[in-house]
């Protein structure tokens, strides 16, 4: 028999040659043809290609070379020397050898001589280190087996590997791989195997030395056909005399290469040629014609191993090679879909099946691709009889994503990953809530969107931060219950039975307010979820054998998650069973970090045959579809620092110290993948990369191999100014995207109608932003006015306008915090103080109010929080004592019904009133807005009951110190007139935003009242500086724009708004509102 070598520039030519070979049947009609392929994607494409050429592809078995090697060496069912099997006995050897002198280096790395936390941390590396060493030993056996025989040339700092390997060989009851390899070679030379008479090895660009030796030996009694994609027969012939491995540093073959891309990207092919034995036959299947395009010229130059620019002039419409510089990954996908739509529109014969998209980092781009393509059912093209402008045409393109990690595709395995992360962490509020929001957990506990909103609110209000309970916190040196899940859940459950107003608590548990009766069942489900999660995390701790870890993880998933289909559970059980089978009956104990490392590796992305060539647009990593011809090949994400992969040299890898030709180098492998992609494109090659930072706009260079491609294209033609690079703007609605010829020749770049509308808007004539309101709304009907509505309006007149329109202003989203409070800011201090003051006024003692606040978990922990609570308690006690001094009678309620004239009335109830006094108290520093909230009810009492001498007493904190500030307001002589004027302001404020911000207008009127400069005082309150001013309030920003000046509020007076001494609306409205109040101030003692 013989070794037959078939070479071609593209794999479709090789496939046609393989079809011709298979058309000549074997003597045995029942014999199966065996074809070895490098990846699942190649297998799918090749089977379809053979079916197309032969009419049917049957009795052909596709396998990868490793499965054939396993069959030849008798390890098809179980290979004890595979890295995943070898790791378990290796772990045992390492554990038993840590005290040996030769193992000191490894023992130090694993913390054998450490104590406490450092010991636990380093011991968590055990599996990861053992698996890495198992991979190194397997690499030695596959690429340089002689090293395992004599360990010749091993550096002194790696001498421990020899002793470790020898101990491992004694532990495993099987021939070591180098001995097994030698025996297999002898057997193959002596006699034929049970394999088919004819075998084919298709599409490989790199084979380890041992596999080449085995295949060569196999060719002794079998016909072995090696179908090798090689870009240049000229280069092959030039290097044909260079044979045999040698140190890579001594390889000078690149000097004999004529084309720069073959020199920089084709090292893997050159080194493979050195390893191959002399074939019995050598066939080259070349192409006679190339497209008259830039891509065709490049491919023909590569085939000729020469740069031949003579007579070539690049045509502007030639877009056969496109390189797109974008602002980040998201923008790359935007550009990609526009490019693909353009290609599909220009060529009606082009179909999605003819397009291949490859990217080095599939997990980064997968969600972006899912959002950018294939949403036709989610984003309909039409809305009723109208075109939906938000629907991008690319949403009609169906996309198939391959190579995804199992934790991304299987929801139960995603839950497993979350559980392992929680088990080794602090169980923060956000982590637990994220788990609760996952689909399987929602299904198990019946959580709806409203339920999750309520649970999030409970978590926030109960001040849950991290840790399940005191025991869970103990490893962190924190053993108090506050801010734990146990603390918060107890508050929620207690809130089911009693409210916060009951002034009662159970031990350290203060009932949570607002747990309504219709949420009782949800509170139970929430508590059940947290309790089951706590038990699962407890089980996922300590040290135990692998099967116990997997049993505990399975039990936790069963308790917490429920898939809506059967396949996720079946796949999870299959994956766990495979892990257990590889480990065998090992009793080696593992830690949580070991199990994480194990599952992270096992559940990583892997290609499956069903994800390729399904008629849709295929998206995958760079490996599965390498060398497979497509009319359009797109490479996405060729960013500097991402491609080629940054493979840091493993300091323990003896091969990396002095690599030989033919040994694996992932950066060289990635360069070869780029060369394969260039040759696989038959019509168009599209490449995108991040050429500018999406936040700062700072320019970023392309990946080095991509830069080499761009430089080579510049010398492929006589056009020295050739530039295939398109630099895209940051935004998809930039006008360059829609102007014909701005980015691509003669036509607009984008197909997005929304981008066109936005571009037109953004490129229109620039003008000053129009005022939010140019004219007031029609006046409201002169209905009666409720006192409560009047009070609410004057809390913030500008916001009152938006409230009247049911207009929602921007607000800060209240999320949960994972940080335990060690201090409280001013707003939090006010919240706590106001609550304690209210408790004291409702009858609680200051000490009891302090105890209740401590049980809420809002204060810092331990003595720090207790001291803070004492300070707040004392301040609240002073305020309450001052208020109770004026509340010397029981509070009464007074109904008011006041005729304002013109058929309108002001109605409502004023309470509580203590004798002739309205007494209000606030924890805030007493200011104008607090006085105003007492002034309006005082006017109502004075107007409704004019025969009494009413007084409003306002109490609050002072600007400095602790002594409460007390202000008094006496009843005016004309309360009805003043109320009518307030109602007039109220009517005007519902028609337009009035220039009446509360603090600013009070400062203006106070300065006017005291004879100071009103504009200076008001500007201090309005303009933001060290602290936010009223110009930053959302309502004011919406009404007058961001960073509005005080003069923007000083608008000309309108008829009926005049006020003595004021020349603009801010001054007039400020004086109308505040001067009567300021004139009514009087001492209360």
From Swiss-Prot:
This is RecBCD enzyme subunit RecC. It comes from Mycolicibacterium smegmatis (strain ATCC 700084 / mc(2)155). Keywords: ATP-binding, DNA damage, DNA repair, DNA-binding, Exonuclease, Helicase, Hydrolase, Nuclease, Nucleotide-binding. It comes from the Bacteria. NCBIfam families: recC (TIGR01450). In the RecBCD complex, RecB has a slow 3'-5' helicase, an exonuclease activity and loads RecA onto ssDNA, RecD has a fast 5'-3' helicase activity, while RecC stimulates the ATPase and processivity of the RecB helicase and contributes to recognition of the Chi site. It holds the Pfam family RecC_C. One of its GO terms (molecular function) is ATP binding. The gene is recC. A helicase/nuclease that prepares dsDNA breaks (DSB) for recombinational DNA repair. Binds to DSBs and unwinds DNA via a highly rapid and processive ATP-dependent bidirectional helicase activity. Holoenzyme degrades any linearized DNA that is unable to undergo homologous recombination. In the holoenzyme this subunit recognizes the wild-type Chi sequence, and when added to isolated RecB increases its ATP-dependent helicase processivity. Unlike the case in E.coli, suppresses RecA-dependent homologous recombination, is instead required for single-strand annealing pathway repair of DSB. GO terms for biological process: double-strand break repair via homologous recombination. Heterotrimer of RecB, RecC and RecD. All subunits contribute to DNA-binding.
